[in-house]
Amino acid sequence: TGKNGGNNVNNVNNANLFSLKPTYDIDSENMWGGLYRVIARCNGAIENVSTVLEASSSDESGFNDIAGQAYFVRAWSYFSLTRLWGDVPLWLSLPNNENLHLATSPSKDIYAQIISDAEMAISLMNGNFGTGYPRQYAANMLLAKVYMTLATNPDLRADGLGEMDYWQLAYEQAIQVYGQYSLVADYSSLFTDTNENSSESIWELQISQDAANSQMGRNFTPWKYKLGQ
């Protein structure tokens, strides 16, 4: 097995392809833990924003945008988790002394929550925070991907909805994004730090080599990618 910086390169590639095996290794553990840390922060943001808005509405638009971003990122995190591991614990609030451990929830329920969160994100996000932060189109994009996934996975569909229903739902979300972005001329330039948040980017992770020691970006980079090729 190839190694890179002490990490299993094959597992990182498998994670990128959403074919991670359910065997223990440090990359799997880090990805699982990392996504749930993100979810915990989203849960905290959602709860705190609700508390603040109950006390004051001085910046309701800004707080709504924060909550919308949290709902979107939580949906994205669960979409990543359930595609990798199937049934996973569904945390929608911060743990307390009486609620420290959760059993797994069926993937069908996870997808229902993803859809609910993404729809909430669309209703709340307004683009107040500008470049680098998700906008409602990111949630439209996520919903389109979710609906395409459900169109081809009958066991995950909501009762009463068939394949063509989900393809139509995917189209309705995708068309909301159409015309808002444009493709770059040089595909390889998407993976350079000089072309981040380009005209093609609906939403991307804001990773800085100066600010954090993270290899998360490897999971979203083409396999064996080399700069300029």
Residue ranges, per PLM feature:
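An aromatic- and glycine-enriched ligand-binding surface/loop that stacks and positions planar moieties
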Residues: 1-11, 111, 119-120, 133-229
